[in-house]
Amino acid sequence: MEEIEESPPTSEELVPCKICGRSFFPKVLKKHVPICQKTAAKRRKVFDSGRQRAEGTEISTVKPIKPKLQSSSSSSKSDKPEPPKKQSNWRRKHEEFIATIRAAKSINQVIKDGGPLPPPPPPSYDPDYIQCPYCQRRFGENAADRHIKFCKEQASRISNKSKLAGGDKTKPPARTQYKPPAPKKANSPTASSVSSRLPQRSAYGQGAGTGIPSSKPSSTGSIKSTPSGYSPLRNNSSSLTSPPSEGNMKPKGMVSQSSLRNPSTGIGMNKKKIQNADNCISRNDMKNENDFNYSTTGTKFCHECGTKYPVESAKFCCECGVKRMYI
């Protein structure tokens, strides 16, 4: 690359600008003079950050910062009178300070002696502060102007809410001594409706009350007894749609009133059941007369309150808590 030879410095003299006083070359000065005249004619305003921050708020006491000029400062001082200075309350503040010190010393002495504490000194208020007529608090001049407007709006809102609350009906008192309802008993309407569909306890079964389940009722509504040494026949266990009631719990060997009225039908059904039982009963069932072979099929309804079991594996009733019966 070829080296660029530096030109020797020119011997032109610098000419000062008449407006700003800076010195330029004659060629550059021709361009600078019109620009310098425009800038001198248009003075830039001093940026006031306080006024920008106060825009959009309730603060209107921000004063713009004025540029201080030596020529204008002397004339402004002579024209505008100074605002009167506030009288200092140094004597009053001094007396309050001495009173607080004396009160603190007296309290320390009483604590050492073990006597009763004296009452606290009365509160002192600054007379320069302005008291709010709504909340009775005191603020400075600038703060009081902002606070009183806000406090007035808040007080009007609270008064409107109290009027609306007073016009409404009084609320009922809270039930602090609330007790949950007792669980349903056997004599509830649901249990009575379920038990009405089932065969009632016979006269003989009510007197005995042994609690041993007998054979299932037939389609005619009569309950048959089984011979000694045989377990009751249980057919169509899956077709059980209604819960067994206490009326089904009959002692062995007891006959209902309906079967006594119709002896012919009862005898015929007993013969059929005995024949079926001879085919199904094993030798292990013949050992003890009181042994019953219960299967694992559970009832679909609770025998106490008639509520249907929600799950097949439920062992207790979800309504009354009675243990589930198995057939």
Curated annotation (Swiss-Prot):
Iron listed as a keyword: no
Residues reported in the UniProt entry to bind Zn(2+) 1: 17, 20, 32, 36
Binding positions (Zn(2+) 2): 132, 135, 147, 151
Low complexity biased stretches: 63-76, 211-229
Biased composition (Polar residues): 187-199, 233-245, 255-267
Keywords, sorted A to Z: Metal-binding, Repeat, Zinc, Zinc-finger
Zinc finger region(s), C2HC/C3H-type: 13-42, 128-157
Family recorded in the similarity comment: Belongs to the ZC2HC1 family.
Protein name (record): Zinc finger C2HC domain-containing protein 1A
Organism expressing this protein natively: Danio rerio (Zebrafish)
